[in-house]
């Protein structure tokens, strides 16, 4: 045996990962049914977070499980260039150095970002290795590598030639901080308190006025009309009249449009088509002009008159002051409304009309909708199917151009000489129409998600017809979070059908969001994040992985507390110590058929078959928590607490050979079942077992042996467990030392010698048989044909009765408190799932103990 006395993960993890990579275990073997996953590529903006750790753990469980089942497994790793996020991060870094992107210029800035990418890609790889991910590093990809760049250009040109990519002047979401357009999906709408301002717009040549309500008075500088609903009786006679725009002294018409909500404000609204998407649509219907009043930094431009140069919030203050001075501000109300924010920097988005590149999505989405409707592609949990379809039914064109420097440059060139637009897969140096070399490439880059949408097939070599693409596309499952169903999942499905004529994957498993122990989203601003790499270094990678798996229940977020990692570090120690016990007791071990089995042998082997079935079925169904919980309960509660303890009866006898073989079989099988969850620990222990195999990584997944399922043995042994627990409980409540031999009387059915020896060994009992209940005894177990009593003679019974009554009273108060807690809606909605589970467990334990104490008290009264 080559095992230390304690589990030290730091000594075994690096050793085994390097060995696995060196041996090529993570590469596909080339035979068998393919099982393929492409990793959701982490952004190169910093360290991976706990959400990544969950995502990687669940994927690795699937891959290791399928590899052991004989599948031809391929897990493709890679990283995302993350255009806007990376550019922001590098700009912050440059700012700390007293530099700016503009000072450096585009070429030098891109050089610095490539250095950044190299550094963080290396760090991300190291972090993924730390988590034990069995990815094939020889196939690592990057969303901005040469192969992906070629794929991106081909897709762009193809869609453009089919009329599905177009350039146009439309209302878009502009981030003044990031200085780029965002897609609708990149805008986070946050409910905020605000003011609703009621402003008088006087009729031309009259002292009368109409009152409009607005949350953005600064935008009135760009107003071109006032609109009312044609069905609104209050405004029947004013359509076609004009009003004078306050502060700007510009006449604007009053129009009618059914979009206007008569219930909002006064039922009359200002129309600012250059800065509101709904107003934009109204203006197009009524052929109104567009007056843009903001520049790229959301400051008022020359169209704003004397307010030019003010930022939007300064302008709001100034406009309100002037409106009030001039008597135009009627009143102000408090309201709540949703405000769009940039998903990267949190700045408030400014709607603007700009020339941008778009993908026409309606026709592209049809096949992607059908695939999910007919379950050609399956969402797990199923409720995410409705979320996906709702978005797809209401899909809008995708704005794909970004005013950034880092990313895939739009593959479009413009001839300065003849104004020709050239869309090409290769760089253009000369105009194909006029021959001029005065050519400029489009300044914009493509949305990061454009390249990510091609990930399942571009990582396998597309547009080249590679062996990998032929063999491993479509992939098997995508494991991801719900927050990128629209950004990524939907677009991958669309592009897969468009360019491969096949789905990109069969299953989409949507995992949980990790929150802190109070249920809050983990974030830098709250300072409540838990770093997975720090946890791996502190507790070991296997306990971190097992913790994440055991809490990965479908349909509920994970409320994570660091102490959970310590709990499953203790489980890892338990596995280590159990393995040491088995190995220490293998003197003269020889493999032999499992014949002449004891009751305990038959029981544990039967339970083992059932845990094989449960774990296998749970992994197939993505029920990772059920698989992990079943393994935990089997190994700790059944194998360690009962079988190993019972084996001590035999290991020093002549009959130890069979017990040794059962111990080896159960430990070997358990380690193989544990391997997808705890790869390092399972490999280290498995290598010390007297079993044949090169590595647990490529060992066979356990199969159920139905000949070993024995319901009768389970029933009989579990009855003994109840008797032993009953005796232990009585001894504990009566303050009898656990190891003190105590007289135990059995009335009714006689036990066989084997059963008696288990009870005596595991409960410190001396068994006698009686024909009636003896005096001075406490009941330990009752069944239809058997009663078991513990002798309490010699104890001060009156004193024990008083003590028991006091304990019962105390427990009843605890029970009432737990019941009150579990009926509190506030506790149930806000407490972590683990805290609720603990409270229920505590209540169950209290009720069990009350039952025992009341039984003993009744016996003594």
Swiss-Prot record:
SUPFAM superfamilies: Anticodon-binding domain of a subclass of class I aminoacyl-tRNA synthetases, Nucleotidylyl transferase, tRNA-binding arm, ValRS/IleRS/LeuRS editing domain. Monomer. Its main location: cytoplasm. InterPro entries: aa-tRNA-synth_I_CS, aa-tRNA-synth_Ia, Anticodon_Ia_Val, M/V/L/I-tRNA-synth_anticd-bd, Rossmann-like_a/b/a_fold, tRNA-bd_arm, tRNAsynth_Ia_anticodon-bd, Val-tRNA_synth_C_sf. It catalyses: tRNA(Val) + L-valine + ATP = L-valyl-tRNA(Val) + AMP + diphosphate. This is Valine--tRNA ligase. One of its GO terms (cellular component) is cytosol. Keywords: Aminoacyl-tRNA synthetase, ATP-binding, Coiled coil, Cytoplasm, Ligase, Nucleotide-binding, Protein biosynthesis. ValRS has two distinct active sites: one for aminoacylation and one for editing. The misactivated threonine is translocated from the active site to the editing site. Catalyzes the attachment of valine to tRNA(Val). As ValRS can inadvertently accommodate and process structurally similar amino acids such as threonine, to avoid such errors, it has a 'posttransfer' editing activity that hydrolyzes mischarged Thr-tRNA(Val) in a tRNA-dependent manner. Belongs to the class-I aminoacyl-tRNA synthetase family. ValS type 1 subfamily. The keyword Ligase applies.
């Amino acid at each position: 045996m080559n095992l230390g006395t304690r589990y030290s993960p730091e000594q075994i993890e690096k050793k085994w990962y390097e060995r696995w990579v060196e041996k090529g275990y993570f590469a596909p073997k080339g035979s068998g049914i393919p099982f393929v996953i492409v990793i959701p590529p982490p952004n190169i903006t910093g360290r991976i977070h706990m959400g990544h750790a969950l995502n990687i753990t669940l994927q690795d469980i699937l891959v290791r499980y399928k590899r052991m089942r004989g599948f031809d497994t391929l897990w493709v790793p890679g990283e995302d260039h993350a255009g806007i996020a990376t550019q922001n991060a590098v700009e912050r870094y440059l700012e700390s150095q007293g530099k700016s992107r503009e000072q450096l210029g585009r070429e030098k800035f891109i050089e610095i970002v490539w250095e950044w990418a190299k550094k963080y890609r290396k760090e991300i790889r190291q972090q993924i290795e730390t988590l034990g991910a069995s990815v094939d590093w020889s196939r690592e990809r990057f969303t901005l590598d040469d192969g992906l760049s070629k794929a991106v250009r081909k897709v762009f040109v193809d869609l453009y030639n089919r009329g599905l990519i177009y350039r146009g002047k439309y209302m878009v979401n502009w981030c003044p901080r990031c200085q780029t357009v965002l897609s609708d999906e990149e805008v986070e709408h946050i409910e905020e308190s605000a003011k609703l301002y009621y402003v008088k717009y006087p009729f031309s040549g009259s002292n009368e006025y109409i009152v409009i309500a607005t949350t953005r008075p600064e935008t009135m500088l760009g107003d071109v009309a006032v609109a009312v609903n044609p069905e609104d009786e209050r405004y029947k006679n004013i359509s076609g009249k004009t009003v004078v725009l306050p502060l700007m002294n510009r006449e604007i018409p009053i129009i009618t449009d059914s979009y206007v909500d008569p219930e909002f404000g006064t039922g009359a609204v200002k129309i600012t088509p250059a800065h509101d998407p709904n107003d934009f649509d109204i203006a197009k219907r009524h052929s109104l002009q567009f007056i843009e009043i903001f520049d790229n930094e959301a400051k008022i431009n020359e169209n704003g008159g004397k307010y030019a140069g003010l930022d939007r919030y300064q302008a709001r203050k100034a406009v309100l002051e002037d409106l009030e001075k001039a008597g135009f501000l009627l009143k102000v109300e408090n309201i709540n409304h949703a405000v769009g924010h940039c998903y990267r920097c949190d700045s408030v988005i400014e709607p603007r009309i700009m020339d941008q590149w778009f993908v026409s999505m309606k026709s592209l989405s049809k096949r992607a909708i059908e695939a999910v409707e007919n379950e050609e592609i399956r969402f797990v949990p199923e409720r995410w199917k409705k979320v996906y379809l709702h978005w797809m039914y209401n899909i809008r064109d995708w704005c794909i151009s970004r005013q950034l420097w880092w990313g895939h440059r739009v593959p479009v060139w413009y001839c300065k000489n003849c104004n020709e637009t050239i869309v090409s897969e290769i760089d253009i140096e000369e105009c194909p129409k006029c021959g001029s070399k005065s050519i400029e490439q489009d300044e914009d880059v493509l949305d990061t998600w454009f390249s990510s949408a091609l990930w399942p097939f571009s990582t396998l070599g597309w547009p080249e017809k590679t062996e990998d693409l032929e063999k491993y596309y479509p992939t098997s499952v995508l494991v991801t979070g719900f927050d990128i169903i629209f950004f990524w999942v939907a677009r991958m499905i669309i592009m897969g059908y468009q360019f491969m004529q096949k789905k990109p994957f069969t299953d989409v498993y949507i995992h949980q969001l990790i929150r802190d122990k109070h249920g809050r989203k983990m974030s830098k601003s709250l300072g409540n994040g838990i770093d997975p790499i720090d946890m791996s270094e502190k507790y070991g990678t296997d306990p971190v992985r097992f913790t994440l798996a055991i809490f990965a229940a479908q349909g509920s977020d994970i409320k994570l507390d660091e102490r959970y990692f310590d709990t499953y570090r203790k489980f890892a120690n338990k596995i280590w110590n159990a393995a040491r016990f088995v190995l220490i007791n293998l003197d003269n071990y020889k493999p032999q058929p499992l014949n002449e089995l004891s009751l305990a042998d038959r029981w544990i082997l039967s339970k083992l078959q059932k845990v094989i079935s449960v774990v296998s079925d749970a992994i197939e169904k993505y029920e990772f928590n059920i698989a992990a919980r079943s393994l935990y309960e089997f190994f700790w509660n059944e194998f360690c607490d009962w079988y190993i303890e019972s084996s001590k009866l035999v290991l020093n006898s002549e009959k130890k050979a069979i017990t040794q073989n059962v111990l080896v079989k159960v430990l070997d099988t358990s380690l193989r079942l544990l391997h997808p969850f705890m790869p390092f620990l399972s490999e280290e222990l498995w290598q010390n077992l007297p079993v044949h195999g090169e590595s647990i990584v490529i060992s066979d997944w356990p199969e159920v042996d139905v000949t070993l399922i024995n319901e009768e043995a389970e029933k009989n042994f579990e009855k003994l467990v109840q008797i032993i627990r009953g005796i232990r409980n009585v001894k504990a409540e009566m303050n009898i030392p656990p190891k003190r031999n105590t007289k135990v009387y059995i009335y009714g059915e006689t036990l066989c010698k084997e059963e008696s020896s288990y009870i005596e060994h595991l409960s410190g009992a001396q068994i006698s048989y009686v024909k009636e209940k003896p005096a001075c005894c406490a009941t330990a177990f009752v069944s239809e044909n058997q009663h078991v009593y513990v002798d309490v003679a010699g104890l001060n019974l009156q004193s024990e009765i008083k003590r028991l009554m006091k304990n019962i009273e105390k427990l009843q108060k605890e029970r009432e408190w737990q019941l009150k807690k579990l009926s509190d809606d506030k506790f149930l909605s806000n407490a972590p799932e683990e805290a609720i589970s603990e409270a229920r467990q505590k209540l169950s334990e209290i009720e069990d103990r009350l039952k025992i104490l009341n039984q003993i008290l009744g016996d003594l009264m």
